[in-house]
Amino acid sequence: WDYINSVSDAMAWDQFFINPNIESIGMTYGYMKNYEDRVRRAVNTPDSKGNYALWQGGMEPNIPVGSTEGVSASMEKALAGAERELKEGASGKWVAHWKMVHIVRPVWEKSGKANQMGRSFEKLSYTQEDADGLIHLDSAPRTIRGARNLLSVGLQYGNAFGQGMQAAALKPADFFGNDNVLYLMEDMATGEIRLSILW
């Protein structure tokens, strides 16, 4: 996820590199998909002694409090994300809210394996196509509301951090009062990523 910040900073000089609305940048989006693929292949490549690292999946930021429809839709999305990560080779996942444990843990329990260390993956390659994939922008919406959302959550996190909180439950101000849009747990990466995308 933090790769959004890295690639946005690295490409800040390029006037044609404009990220879409942050809601579109999931782990299956353009450069994120290619980045994750390289990570999983690198992590699952043994060292000179045959030892493997453990690839842990991403963080599930949903806080399951809201309308029935909103919670249901978010849980379906979280479950699909966990199942995708298991398929891709992750050995687990971490959650921002304890209520999410019973949603994602069964995904790995039903696999019947303690982890996926040593799973065979295609070896890393270092081609121009690989490099281009790490900055690839898929077609996705770029709207004023998207910019407002970036700014809104970034300012909210700055306020929370200034009060001594390292993490906070946030959502864009445009959705205050809309219980179909859940709060997400945000941390310092939120400020870095959102500011990087904005500039």
Model-derived segments and spans:
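Conserved alpha/beta-domain cores
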Residues: 1-199
